[in-house]
Amino acid sequence: MIGIHCHNKPMTDYEPIPPPTNFHDQAEHSWTLPANWYTDSKVFEKEKKQIFYKNWWYVGTVRQLSKPGQIFTTTVVDQEVFVIRGEDNVLRAFYQENFRGTRGVKDIEDFNPSNFGLESVRVETLVGLVFVNLDANADALTDISESMVKDMRAYCPRLDDLVLSKSYELQTAANWKTLVDNNLESYHSAVAHPSLMGLLDYSTFEVWEDRFTTCHAMTNSNLDNPAYKLDSKDSVKRAIYSWLWPNTAFFIAPGPKNLGVFQMVPTGPESSLQRWEFYFENEQPTESEQAYLDWTINTLIPEDTALYENVQHGLRSQGYSQGRFVINRNRPEWSEHHVHQFQTLVRDAIMADC
């Protein structure tokens, strides 16, 4: 049984949430998180405070801040922050609420954040990408992602040199966890993604986890496949999909050097924004890279989006409250133990100060 229990504590600005029934630390014996955790506004408010305000959130690229004085603003759920490169060439981030002049910062002579009473936000970089964290006591991004990044670089060296080629966003009628759950299991691919099944050889499927990351890897099965055409000279022969807690995923697909970033942005208890960014060796995609983009945006993403929204609809059914995890560690392509890992992190975060 779950090892975290709520004790009598002073009331906070949100109601206590009861622990999920029959959720076990061992995946083989566990039920899933309850359906109302995917629909309840109280759970969503708790997630903002206990998950998104305390973990690493993708905000942009290092290239956007390549010169001293360059700045961009962003939002962590509902908290506005800005990131700036100082004259000392160091990246810094701050809450924006107490400073209305961020757009003109680069024009302010000898700009010093302390002169404006700005509260700092932690900022780190990862393979040329910028992340912020509102929690001053959180684990370092480099520490929690070290193993994942090592694996990503093994599949696609010199990731930091890739440049942004295409951005794509899509509003989705599903809780952010519905998106993560779907992306961490692969048994839906046989039915939902026929062209993906032609691109990748699922008999080569591998999955491995660290504390806050998961990686899936598969070999390309056919150069002339129904997804997009490949060349024998392409540098990436084996796909790797990596997930970083809580809501960022990275795709390295068969083909020329590439990186896809998929951020599952929560916008409400039953709504999310899919934020996709695609990186190649040059800003202008080649013909083969464009074919990959077209397939991903016009085929793969719509197929998954239909699943997200159908699952979310089912979670509102009065006939469903919880399910059981499908666990088969000898057949990882059919197993949900990595989904259980994610849901355990959610449970622990929500129950942390109940």
Locate the predicted segments by residue.
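N-terminal pre-ligand scaffold of iron-sulfur
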Residues: 6-95, 122-123
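Short, flexible segments with low predicted structural confidence
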Residues: 15-23, 102, 149-152, 235-236
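Rieske [2Fe-2S] iron-sulfur-binding domain
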Residues: 3-5, 64-136, 142-150
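Alpha-helix initiation/capping motif
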Residues: 16-20, 34, 61, 116, ...
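Short, solvent-exposed coil/turn linker segments
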Residues: 34-36, 61, 112, 140, ...
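C-terminal catalytic domain of Rieske-type non-heme iron oxygenases
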Residues: 6-10, 84-90, 121-125, 129-354
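Short Pro/Gly-enriched beta-strand edge/turn motifs at strand-loop
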Residues: 53-66, 101-107, 243-247
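Glycine-rich, flexible loop/turn motifs
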Residues: 29, 33, 107, 192, ...
